[in-house]
Amino acid sequence: MKTINLISLDNSDVKYRIDRFPDGEVQFVLTEEIDRKEEYNVECRITNAEQLFILIQVGDILDRQGVVWVLHIHYLMGMRMDRVMSFERPFTLKIVGKMISQMGYEKCYVDTAHSIRTMLEIRECVSLETYPYKFLMEVVKEPDIEVVYPDHGALERYEGEEGDELYFEKERDIETGNIKSFIFKNEDVVNKGKCFMFFDDLCDAGGTFLGELEILKKMYPEAKFYIRVTHIVNEVGFDNLCKNFDRVYATESYRDWGKVAKEKGYDNFVVC
């Protein structure tokens, strides 16, 4: 299987270029012939409408060539807008899902989809999950780390049980929707309290993580604090995590954060 890597041309088996017309419109152009006997894997991130447009152009080329191909979306624009918020707002995920689903791929893989709605709106879609305890054993490889889920949604995502998992509940202001306080649940099952790892799918500005981190630091002042998220979508959040946690694990689904970490001198950031 050959890869068409829309994130990095250097890592693409199939070479291409992206032209831009005077009006700003982009056009994807293959610079070598497609082998119709070969299967293809398209790697991409969709953080904006232009990246989605480029992907659809790639799909058009592959479908007209009649080749078998699979799609791997590392970050999917609109996946947080997975419901109708009001009649005055669009159902963004449904719109994006329809555009992707019309392509002729065999299977679509999405890194840590925000909710099951992604699989319902995109044809033949599978979410690629990273589970906490497997991650600790295979990547971190340190003893005495206790997993903390930042909210009930994260707890449910990773199939934890309320009775024996550490997690936070958020108390919100009914009128404003702002978070008033965080409540740490199941403190009685804390084992050694030497190291805690927050685990979630996404970080925006990071306010929830920082508020909960402050509580745990007061409770366990000698402990180390790690965090693992799949998607960091905001440089403010990236800075907040790297400046406050002892170690930050994240993918480069949204942006090449490893390069940013080097530029800013964050030696506690790990791409995973």
Locate each region found by the language model.
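PRPP-associated nucleotide enzymes
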Residues: 1-272
